[in-house]
Amino acid sequence: MKRGNFMEYSAIFHDMDKRFSYAVDKDLFVIRVQVKKDDMKEVILHYEDKYIPMERKDTRKTVPMKKVAVSQFHDYYEAQIKMHLICLRYFFEFTDTQGEKVYYGNYEFDKECITNRDRMFDCPQNLREEEMFEVPEWAANKVVYQIFPSRFAATEPVDKELWYKAPITPMDDLHGNLRGIIEHMDDIQNLGIDVLYMTPIFQSNSCHKYDTTDYYQIDPSFGTTEDLKELVQKAHERGMKVVLDAVYNHTGREFFAFADILENGEKSKYRDWYFIDGFPLKSEWGEIPNFKCFGYYGGMPKLNLKNPEVEKYITDVACYWIKECDIDGWRLDVGDEISHFFWKNFRKAVKAVKKDMLIIGEIWHYAGDFLEGDEWDTVMNYPFYLNLIDLLADEKITVSQFVQNLGYLKGRLHKNCYPLMWNLIDSHDTARFLHLCNDNKKKQHLAAAFQLLLPGMPMIYYGDEYAMPGANDPDCRRGMYWDEEYQDKEMYEWYKRLIQVRKSHACIVEGELAGSVTEDEEGTIVLIRKNGEETIAMIFNCSSSAKKFNEYTQKYNLLTENTFDGNVEGFDAAVIVL
């Protein structure tokens, strides 16, 4: 409710869950609250020990909360508390821009300071150490490179006309394999990549391999288990991690369990491995199958993971490849169509084998319910992708809205998760960003700057560094640009420089956001970050014409390695050391 110019009570939101109230470790506790945008002059957190009575010791403390994120309609305030309490009781003190003051505890508002602990929020999460959101220490802000193996590199001669065919079809066999990736490992490393992610490599009859027929076999067209072991070893020698694609939502029709159902029908002992509505099975092209499958594709029947046999089989598969080849992560295909119950057990199983395994979910929307520390570590950040599409490709949002959309995710996601978000501008499931921008390379130039200069794990889709084109799937999966005549060397050097700057100045992605200025009419964004003694201004010009930033002249521009003259060209960026 809004009463004249007074505080907007209905916009205030806090919950005692792992998004708004959680222990980062044994000594650090984070509390957040959401309020109406620009409504508050000051937010103060009051907290005290739940179990020590006042007559014994006064444990009451207060701490000013910092505004850490801004979305379209809300501000997010945060307090980080160093504490050694068994259990915490707390409440908020709000003072709005008109001077009105109110206290908020246990989901109730009060005009007087709260003294009754029963009227405060109660959070014992620092006691429950087994529930703390622990993520792999190696992962935060690392740079990921996505490869579609059949189209990346081949070890046998492939007709050049076929390799660079456009548009390409699912039937075009380019003979890419694991050995080809191994032979180009130096190229991947030289770009500055930290994590290599491959789409499915297990046995399948399709080009994309998302319809698995044998989870325990590398597809023969890609190589052998020994090839995968060598690939992982060579990646590790270069300081890179390897993530594989886990397709556990569905199988292919030739997978042994479904093949048995096709042969034996109702008498099959595997009939409960899937969701079958009736016999005989119907899956002719053009008709809706009478069994659950991925997207009504009869060639991808959905597994019944609530069946203990199926759950064990799939979990054993995941653990097997960790033990066998020492991989570093699983990317979970169609992860949001599988139950929370399964993923909780899955996490326990794979983390027991390798504690610092990275678990990445595929989900195209906000994923807070999967990111509470007991399922996934992070997700493919499609909201980031859609935000950039809206800003640069479709030009339907302002720079202010773009920054606000970024703020929404930061304000809602767990502190440990945010630096692990896989920020992408395209993937094997989307048209290339360049295509969506009508081949405007300047727009991709700027999109890469956003991708590589913001917190998270930027995921570069193979070939983006050479400005590879491509429409929607399957055309986005063309043969990699290995011949210089096809490569955009200027784009490559831009990607490489962005990665170098990102890695050489931790302030860029780890620094606290100390200021944000957006000019909608000009189409410009300036983000100020501070980290210890270093302060950096990141300037993004989202318009087609050059803009002046005279306040930063004579400072050093990390991207050009020259003194900044105050000018930023259209669809360009600058990183200024202050």
Predicted feature residues:
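Aromatic/acidic polysaccharide-binding cleft in carbohydrate-active enzymes
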Residues: 150, 372-374, 378, 419-426, ...
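The feature marks proteins involved in alpha-glucan
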Residues: 1-30, 52-144, 154-169, 173
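Hydrophobic faces of well-ordered beta-strands that scaffold small-molecule active sites
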Residues: 143-145, 196-198, 242-244, 330, ...
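C-terminal beta-strand-rich structural cap/linker in extracellular carbohydrate-active enzymes
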Residues: 4, 37, 88, 564-578
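Substrate-binding/active-site clefts of carbohydrate-active enzymes
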Residues: 142, 148-194, 201-319, 323-324, ...
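Active-site-proximal helices and loops of the catalytic beta/alpha 8
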Residues: 232-240, 255, 259-265, 323, ...
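Conserved, mostly hydrophobic/aromatic
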Residues: 33, 147, 188, 198, ...
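Carbohydrate-binding surface patches
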Residues: 30-32, 516-552
